[in-house]
Amino acid sequence: MANVLDTLMERGYIKQFTHEAETRELLEKEKVTFYIGFDPTADSLHVGHFIAMMFMAHMQKAGHRPIALIGGGTATIGDPSGKTDMRKMMTNETIAHNVACIKKQMEKFIDFSDDKAILVNNADWLLNQNYVEFLREVGVHFSVNRMLSAECFKQRLERGLSFLEFNYMLMQGYDFYVLNKKYNCKMELGGDDQWSNMIAGVELVRKKSQKSAYAMTCTLLTNSEGQKMGKTVNGALWLDPEKTSPYEFYQYWRNVNDADVEKCLKLLTFIPMDEVRRLSSLEGSQINEAKKVLAFEVTKLVHGEEEATKAKQAAEALFGKGGDMSNVPTYEMGKDKLGSELLDILVEAEIVPSKAEGKRLVKQGGLSLNGEKVADFKKTLEEADFENGEVLIKRGKKNYNKIVLA
């Protein structure tokens, strides 16, 4: 049987290891318990988290046991990695709500039945921790000089790094120590932006428990130009259908750049590599077939086959190939809004994030109403604009929404 490490490397997941040869041997000989941490900074996971869950799912399919750690405790501080400013502090009530929402989402992707995976919250051991005891037990193993040289702190030192955030590395390292002690967890997986924090955890386990511990980082989801993927005009690409509709989600992947198709097929689907290579080798207009497969498969994993099929049908209907128009994202508007400015209605319907963005679209010729380009910022929406009680809004080349009179 192939080592899961070969699968992960072939599909492009692995960025860095702490101990590559030992990790390979461990994954061949044992069913390894490993963990990935997720901070509950919002009430939904987004596409950046999805790649981490795919990483976990490949490991679980190979017989290893994942621990999904929700950072209910560390979220009270906020991770400074990759941030230029201190994160806004959240209330305990907000964190608890976000944790509950994220738990529900995770269960779609990871099998938690019969102890095949474990869900834990570090609030259980961090929030009641005695601070002096923590410093004596954990702080003694950390060098401030070494911490200050870590990439996650370097970029913050000039702008100001609070002592609160400086503790984050100790707390994340302590998570690994607790999981190692309680569940014999031997490995931490995470995004490449977590490398410094992960090394700290590995070293803490090795020093304090005298046990072997390992870390592997996953590549971040970036496009061919090195920019993070998963951002839309309305913000992040969420996994919650209330925040990003299955249709919008499908359309995002249907419209990725040609150069990004192969990477996305590798990282975000379970399609066998032979088929990934075949799809990725398509050229010209044929690459659109690969994009349709990508969009359908990713949407199916996140929202289920039924929603993926509806999104596909909606896209086909809008591009003149038949299909069901009823699945296009729809906003119901009361008749009392007739005569209001179109841009105000689009902002209220969350079709555009702001009036300024709406004006930019109009200026660039990127906003259409029933196939006619909107040229006037102050265009009002009148009853005459509605055909059979609805209007079709098009943003850019391929984003559609319907407004119906309620």
From Swiss-Prot:
Catalytic activity: tRNA(Tyr) + L-tyrosine + ATP = L-tyrosyl-tRNA(Tyr) + AMP + diphosphate + H(+)
Cysteines joined through disulfide linkages: none
Main location: cytoplasm
Species classification: Bacteria, Bacillati, Bacillota, Clostridia, Eubacteriales
'KMSKS' region (motif): residue ranges: 228-232
Binding-site residues, L-tyrosine: Y35, Y168, Q172
Source domain of life: Bacteria
Function: Catalyzes the attachment of tyrosine to tRNA(Tyr) in a two-step reaction: tyrosine is first activated by ATP to form Tyr-AMP and then transferred to the acceptor end of tRNA(Tyr).
GO biological process terms held by the UniProt record: tyrosyl-tRNA aminoacylation
Family recorded in the similarity comment: Belongs to the class-I aminoacyl-tRNA synthetase family. TyrS type 1 subfamily.
Keyword Cytoplasm attached: yes
Presence of the UniProt keyword Metal-binding in the record: no
Keywords associated with the record: Aminoacyl-tRNA synthetase, ATP-binding, Cytoplasm, Ligase, Nucleotide-binding, Protein biosynthesis, RNA-binding
Subunit structure: Homodimer.
Subcellular location per the Swiss-Prot or TrEMBL entry: Cytoplasm
EC number: 6.1.1.1
Entry-linked PANTHER family: TYROSINE--TRNA LIGASE, MITOCHONDRIAL (PTHR11766:SF0), TYROSYL-TRNA SYNTHETASE (PTHR11766)
UniProt domain S4 RNA-binding: residue ranges: 340-404
GO molecular function annotations of the record: ATP binding; RNA binding; tyrosine-tRNA ligase activity
Name of the featured protein: Tyrosine--tRNA ligase
